[in-house]
Amino acid sequence: MVNQLKFKGILIVISSPSGAGKTSLANSIVDENENISFSTSVTTRPPRDGEKNGREYHFVEKDQFNLMIKNKRFIEYAEVFGNYYGTLKDQIEKLLNDGKDIIFDVDWQGGTKIRNSYLSPLVVSVFILPPSIKTLHERLLNRNKDDDKTVKLRMKESRSEISHWSEYEYIMINDNFEKIKKNIVKIIEIEKMRRNKQILLPDFISKLNNEFEEFISNS
């Protein structure tokens, strides 16, 4: 286990039902904020049109994924719609040690495992709700990524996903994309001011005390 006191960044877990906007929000936030990075998951699902290995996901075969599980490479992993997704330990630890804040676009299973991991003191969790079920269904249809059968399955699973909303610290209704995006960035800024998130604060307080001693001795 890596000493978490060396970490300088925080982890932002964003979850939502499929179609509620978590991936679009996460990508836009990362694009506009150079100190925020995206957690690139490993997955066994096939790449979609336009996706590149190592950008949206690290695409692997199931045998390779199982080997990574055996070798304890993941902070968390879960099966979603018949495909496996996992978060790499070494990738996350490197980004945190480089001072990056990291956004996770994960379902409630992944969110729970990250919050319960050894990195839990660094985690901030956000759940995104759709403005209505009708809007959620329309978004799934309009993105043209899935056939009708898969859309129906995603709608069924969405109810289960939404049932976990109360496990998250911050809840937002995605009825205004730009507003929600700005609010998430504000949350990140505020959370980094919390005492337990400012891991270099004890060193700074020690420095102030040394300066006090020097000031008193010279007075």
Which residues does each PLM region occupy?
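Conserved glycine(s) of the Walker
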Residues: S16, G21
